[in-house]
């Protein structure tokens, strides 16, 4: 049997990781400024993480949600305190797409509506509802194209209010900082106006924090820079530092019903242990604060590089979620960074470098990256 070939791959086999570095099967070291799509939060193979998962695996890896799992309760309590959402409820699943699916289902269950507003260039996942609110026709199959979603420009409050006033919108789903969309940022004025309009018209506000959340922006959640409190918050990626996990933070206004939502693997013992290890390291190593401090330094250094090299036309983002907009396609730049400078970055669109490193990134790592990027930009 062959793999179903849907991923355009770099010819590199990564076999080892530590902190912000990874190594291939030939022993070549790489600086990791992408963290596997913003998944790696506390660094590759953090010793506390490895120890906790190993110990848990020696006891119990999995049992079903038909019995008590005190690790789930502990995680919900810890996450509530860390994020400032102690009064919310927590539903555990396996991925970001699944988190968005369940958030949208909860909203629709509660207000009985079916229409959703989503931001242009949004990406919320590849499963049924999640892909429908994703603004990319290439990945929406006919079976998913049900006409439930209206895509609107980011930060155009008037356009959103006009749609909400129709009184039939189930939910608005937004990323405070767009990921695949290119690190575009929601403004405070738009976010607060949207929240007020949602409350006025009986619409639920969902914040997708799967990529921009979990400390990456320099606050626990990126929407906390905007002064809003969403009805539903979706998390994944950094929550498990590579272990598949997702969740929905659910406001107290939602009343749970037996059988309403469910999952086989979600919230399993290993996943909860991974998430608890992440929170331990967040607290011990002050990683949210580090993301803010080192992120500001990264953005400042990219803007200095922009002054020296005209290929960078704009620097976007916050914390350790940063986009460098280029006046040339990113393809050659990324290829040279990987194959010649041995540095991983991501991309968005056709001309944006997306930088999503582990939150343990240091200023020395930033200086190292800027040097490698400058070398490449001089050559292209």
Model-based region annotation:
Residues 1-380:
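Conserved N-terminal phosphate-binding loop of PLP-dependent enzymes in the Aspartate aminotransferase
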């Amino acid at each position: 049997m062959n793999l179903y070939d849907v991923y355009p791959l770099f010819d590199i086999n990564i076999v080892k990781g530590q902190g912000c570095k990874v190594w291939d099967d030939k022993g070549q070291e790489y600086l990791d400024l992408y963290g596997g799509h913003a998944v790696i939060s506390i660094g590759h193979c953090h010793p506390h993480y490895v120890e906790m998962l190993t110990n848990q695996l020696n006891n119990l890896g999995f049992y079903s949600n038909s019995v008590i799992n005190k690790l789930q309760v502990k995680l919900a309590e810890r996450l509530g305190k860390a994020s400032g959402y102690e009064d919310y409820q927590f539903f555990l699943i396996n991925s970001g797409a699944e988190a968005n699916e369940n958030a949208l289902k909860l909203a629709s269950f509660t207000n009985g509506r079916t229409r959703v507003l989503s931001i242009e260039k949004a990406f919320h996942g590849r499963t049924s509802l999640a892909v429908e609110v994703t603004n990319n026709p290439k990945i929406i199959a006919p079976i998913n194209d049900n006409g439930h979603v209206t895509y609107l420009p980011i930060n155009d409050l008037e356009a959103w209010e006009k749609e909400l006033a129709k009184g039939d919108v189930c939910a608005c789903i937004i990323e405070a900082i767009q990921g695949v969309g290119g690190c575009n940022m929601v403004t405070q004025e738009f976010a607060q106006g949207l929240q007020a309009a949602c409350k006025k018209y009986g619409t639920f506000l969902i914040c997708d924090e799967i990529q921009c959340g979990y400390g990456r922006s320099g606050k626990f959640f990126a929407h906390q820079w905007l002064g809003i409190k969403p009805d539903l918050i979706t998390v994944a990626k950094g929550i498990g530092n590579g272990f598949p996990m997702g969740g929905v933070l659910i406001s107290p206004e939602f009343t749970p019903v037996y059988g309403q939502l469910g999952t086989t693997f979600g919230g399993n013992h290993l996943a909860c242990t991974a998430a608890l290890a992440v929170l331990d390291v967040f607290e011990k190593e002050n990683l949210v604060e580090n993301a803010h401090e080192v992120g500001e330094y990264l953005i400042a250094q990219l803007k200095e590089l922009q002054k020296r090299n005209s290929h960078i036309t704009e620097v976007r983002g916050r914390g350790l979620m940063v986009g460098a907009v280029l006046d040339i396609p990113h393809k050659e730049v990324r290829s040279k960074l990987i194959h010649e400078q041995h540095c991983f970055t991501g991309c968005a669109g056709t001309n944006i470098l997306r930088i999503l490193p582990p939150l343990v990134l240091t200023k020395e790592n930033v200086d190292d990256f800027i040097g490698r990027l400058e070398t490449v930009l001089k050559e292209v």
